[in-house]
Amino acid sequence: MQFYDKVLDESLDIINWAFAKNPSNFYSAKGDESKLTCEVIKLFDNDFKYHLDRYKYYQRHKTDPNLHREKCNSILLYLEEVIKKNDWITSTEPSILYISIMPFIRQYRIADCDYFSSMDHKGVTILLKEFESSALFKEVMQKHEQWSKDKNNGAYVS
């Protein structure tokens, strides 16, 4: 995302910018919730994303996908424990935590739906189902006709 004076190139920067622009629509964590939110987001943005990429694209990274799948799963099991101890995470209002980590969890599930379904993380699964059925998700993930250079004379049409 580019502005006149700066570029936001990290997903978390873009999310923070969006929350600052319209804070009333989102659940805002306070105190210990805010600290935990930052910790979990960093865990997903760094460790989970690292292992997710190596799980999904193991041929490109020349790695063992099962090792990285298990690393992701242990992070999800940690999140499961966090959810059990912190019911605010499952608030009906979207939060910065929710917006930041659910796309990663969704990608992980899509990589192997059967494996994901067999894992013991009920809270994570419920959270993902709520995310995918939310109005926010449906609005953002609308399907569009595939862009074609020939069809659009090489121009991008929004």
Regions found by a protein language model. Give the residues of each.
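A structural signal for short, well-ordered beta-strand segments and their strand-loop junctions
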Residues: 9, 28, 89-90, 141
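Short, flexible loop/turn segments with low-complexity composition
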Residues: 28-33, 138-148
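Phosphate/oxyanion-binding loops and surfaces in catalytic or ligand/nucleic-acid-binding neighborhoods
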Residues: 21-25, 111, 134
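GST-like domain detector, emphasizing the conserved glutathione-binding G-site
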Residues: 1-73
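Residues that scaffold the ATP/ADP-binding catalytic core of kinase and kinase-like folds
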Residues: 17, 111, 140
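Acidic/histidine-enriched, glycine/proline-rich intrinsically disordered or flexible terminal extensions
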Residues: 144-158
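GST-like fold's C-terminal all-alpha helical module
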Residues: 40-133
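Long, amphipathic alpha-helical surface segments
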Residues: 130-135, 140, 151-154
